[in-house]
C-alpha cells in the first residue's frame, strides 16, 4: 500500500528502486520486481494513502501487518486497526543512524501497543525522513531485521520482540532490546 511515486530522494534508502523508476508509482514497480524474483508470487497492491477511511477495509484481510511508512500518523493508524482486528503488527522506524523495531501480537492480552511506548503521537516532523535525513544502511539493516520479525510471525518460530523495542544505534554499533508494558489508560488496556 502506497500512493506515492519514486523520487530521487528515495533512492539512497529504498533499495528496490533505481533512477529508471523515478516518477513511477512505487507499488507498481515493487509488484513487477517481486514477480521477477518469483513468478509464482501472489501480490496485491493498493495505490492509496494509508488513511482512516481505507485502512479498516484493507487490513481486515491480512494476518500480519507490516509498517514501512515514513510518518507517525500512519503508524498510529496501523496500530489502531491492528489492535481492533487483533492482528500481528511489525513496525519499523528510522532516523539518521538509528532504527526502531516493534512487534505487537494483539491476540495476546499482555501485548502493549505503539501508544504505550510513545504515550501519544509525537509532534509533526519527529523522525521525518525529509528533515532528519536517513542513512541508507540504517534503512537496509532496520528493514532486514523487520523482515526477519515478519518471517518469525508468519512461521510462528523463534522468539519475537513482543513487548520490546529493538533500538539499533549504527553510529556506535549498539543494539538494545528494551522491555515496555501496557500503559494504564491506553487504547490497548482492555484487549
What does each model-identified segment do?
Residues 1-191:
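Adenine nucleotide-associated cytosolic modules
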Amino acid at each position: 500500500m502506497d500512493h506515492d511515486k519514486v523520487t530521487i530522494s528515495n533512492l539512497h534508502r529504498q533499495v528496490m528502486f533505481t533512477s529508471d523508476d523515478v516518477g513511477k508509482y512505487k507499488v507498481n514497480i515493487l509488484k513487477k520486481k517481486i514477480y521477477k524474483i518469483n513468478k509464482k508470487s501472489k501480490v496485491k497492491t493498493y495505490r492509496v494513502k494509508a488513511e482512516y477511511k481505507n485502512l479498516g477495509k484493507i487490513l481486515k484481510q491480512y494476518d500480519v501487518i507490516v509498517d514501512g511508512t515514513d510518518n507517525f500518523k500512519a503508524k498510529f493508524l496501523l496500530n489502531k486497526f491492528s489492535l481492533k482486528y487483533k492482528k500481528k503488527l511489525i513496525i519499523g522506524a528510522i532516523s539518521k543512524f538509528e532504527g526502531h523495531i516493534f512487534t505487537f501480537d494483539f491476540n495476546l492480552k499482555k501485548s502493549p501497543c505503539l501508544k504505550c511506548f510513545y504515550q501519544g503521537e509525537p509532534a509533526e516532523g519527529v523522525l521525518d525522513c525529509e528533515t532528519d535525513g536517513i542513512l541508507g544502511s540504517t534503512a537496509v539493516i532496520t528493514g532486514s531485521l523487520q523482515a526477519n520479525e515478519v518471517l518469525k510471525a508468519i512461521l510462528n518460530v523463534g522468539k519475537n520482540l513482543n513487548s520490546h523495542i529493538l533500538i539499533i544505534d549504527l553510529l556506535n554499533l549498539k543494539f538494545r532490546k528494551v522491555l515496555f508494558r501496557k500503559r494504564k489508560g491506553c487504547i490497548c488496556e482492555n484487549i
